[in-house]
Structure formats: C-alpha cells, structure tokens
Amino acid sequence: ISEILSKENIVFSTSRNGLNGTNENIRHIKYDVLVDELDPELLPDQIDGFVYCPGTINLRPFRSLKLETFRSDLELNLIGAIKTLQTILPRLQQSPSSSIIFYSTVAVKTGMPFHSSVSSSKSALEGLTKSLAAEFAPKIRVNCIAPSIVNTPLANKFLNTEDKIEKAAARHPLNKIGTAKEIAQLTQYLLDEKSKWITGQVINIDGGISSVKVN
C-alpha cells in the first residue's frame, strides 16, 4: 500500500480485520470475502486498479488434506477473486486504463511437495488471468504475480530461525529470500501506466527458482 500511496493515489483496502495505522488517503472497508457481500456504494465511481491478495498457506502432505481444505483454498483464492471482481468491474470499466493484479505461487509452474491444495486453486487463478486479459482487452489489463517464499509474517513458521532462512535462500539461484517490498514494487509497476503494454502475463518473481538451475 505504501508504494501506491507514494504516487499520491487514494487506496480502498478490504480485510476481515481493521487496518493498522491511519492515513488520510486510505479508506478501509471491513469485508470477509468468504461470507460478506461488498457494498459497491462504499467505493468510488471509478477504480483504476484492483489487487486481490488473500493470505493463506496450506502446506501439508496430500494424504493428510481433507476435501474441505481444497474447497476452502478454492473459495478464497479463486471464487473470492471472481466474486469481488464481479462487484467492482463496472467501476474498473469507467477508468480509461485500469489494471487487475492477482497473486499466484511459483509452485504452480515448478511443482513442489505439499503444495497440492494451494497450487490447484492458484493454477485456476492463472487460467482466469489469461482468459480475462483476452476478454477485457484493450481497456483493462490483467496480470498475475507468482512469487516464491517471501519474508512476511505469513511465512514466519518457515523462516523463524537463521538456519531455516539460510536453507530456504540456498534453494534459489540468487541465494536470497524475497521481500515484501520487492513484491510491492512489481505490483506498483503493473498498476502504473509504465506497464501499459503488459497483459495476460504470469510473472515469476522468485529468485530464479522456477527457471534456472545452478547446482
């Protein structure tokens, strides 16, 4: 959000809980995508960008996953995106050039153990990205960001010791873990007019792990 605010934009954020801190350019709406309906009257008539970034990591062996886990990930990662986008699409269409950004995972392209639930739902989201990019062109751009592991509170249990951080970094050709700022900068670029010739892309930001092998 701070990257977007640095460009003097007004940001409308939604989450199940409140937003930490205050800023006159942020309008927060309490919204649980799984149970609530987003009231379009709370939104501006024109929206220039939509970023859908739910937070969840269900990494477990396939044999221990219940069917409900797959349904839950699909509801949050795919159906929630569709539901929200259907509500705000008329406002995105009012913009002369708007941008939609979804978030996937490097595990869709690479294939990683214990990622079967999240990868299933995120791969569907990547398909949605390409389909909507074709349908909404040329007025609305649609792209998807697919990161590897990023040092955020959501990933804390995987990166809560120096040994875990070093081992995770070593799996990446660039020998480092991604940061929230790096993901935010790519997001800001895809929202900006500077990326107006980019649509229908799944962009890996993953330290090279999805395409390069150095060992």
Question: Where do the protein language model's features map onto the residues?
Answer:
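Active-site loop-to-helix junction immediately N-terminal to the catalytic Tyr of the SDR YXXXK motif
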Residues: 65, 111-119, 131
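Active-site helix of classical SDR
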Residues: 85, 121, 129
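Short C-terminal tail/terminal secondary-structure segment
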Residues: 188, 199-215
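Alpha-helical segment proximal to the catalytic Tyr-Lys
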Residues: 90, 133-138, 196
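Substrate-binding pocket helix/loop in short-chain dehydrogenase/reductase
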Residues: 61-62, 69-74, 168
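Short, flexible catalytic-loop segment of classical short-chain dehydrogenase/reductase
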Residues: 146-157
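Residue(s) in the substrate-gating loop at a strand-loop-helix junction
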Residues: 105
